[in-house]
Amino acid sequence: MSQSHFFAYLSRLKLINRWPLMRNVRTENVSEHSLQVAMVAHALAVIKNRKFQGNVNPERIALLAMYHDASEVLTGDLPTPVKYFNSQIAHEYKAIEKIAQQKLIAMVPEELQDIFAPLLDEHHYTEDEKSLVKQADALCAYLKCLEELSAGNNEFLLAKSRLEKTLAQRHSAEMDYFMQVFVPSFHLSLDEISQDSPL
């Protein structure tokens, strides 16, 4: 039985910091970001099904979100202003991501590749799945901005403004619900969110 470096590579996602050009009060790595995106994507899928007559698989969407940035273990986290500087760079970076995704899939033992390929390669996502993961990704970036701003770090003001436009473009009923029900708490301190339910 041959060895696979797949999970050894994925474990290094925690070494890749997000927002590399920004001063951060608290650094965020790709591994923890992926977990938060998975939780939010799962919630969006549940909300879509329960409140807005959706028919998506929340558990699959959580898994897709968990792996959505896995290729960054090979490419690094390219800053957004660089990634989207122009359409040519954006196109080439997408091609690089695709190569990285295929390289990761090739690391998986052949008898398991049919399970992992649809998680790592977004071309296997349905439109609903892709939309929910992208919404969750943008929401989590927005939440990071709120956390930094609430800690007094104005470095994230423009990023917050840019992400508000992104969220408006990716708007959905389930996102509106999430924004109204869950996001306001991110403006509060620990004392404020725990005062109604002390341990």
Curated annotation (Swiss-Prot):
Alphabetized InterPro entries for the sequence: HD/PDEase_dom, HD_domain, YfbR, YfbR/HDDC2
Source organism per UniProt: Cronobacter sakazakii (strain ATCC BAA-894) (Enterobacter sakazakii)
MF terms in GO: 5'-deoxynucleotidase activity; metal ion binding; nucleotide binding
The name this protein goes by in its record: 5'-deoxynucleotidase ESA_00928
Phylogenetic classification of the source organism: Bacteria, Pseudomonadati, Pseudomonadota, Gammaproteobacteria, Enterobacterales
HAMAP family in the record: 5DNU
Residues that coordinate or bind a divalent metal cation: 33, 68-69, 137
EC code: 3.1.3.89
Single GO cellular component term: cytoplasm
Family: Belongs to the 5DNU family.
Keyword Amino-acid biosynthesis: no
Keywords from the UniProt entry: Cytoplasm, Hydrolase, Metal-binding, Nucleotide-binding
Ranges for domain HD: 30-142
Major location (coarse): cytoplasm
Compartments in which it is found: Cytoplasm
Residue numbers binding substrate: 18-19, 33, 69, 77-80, 137
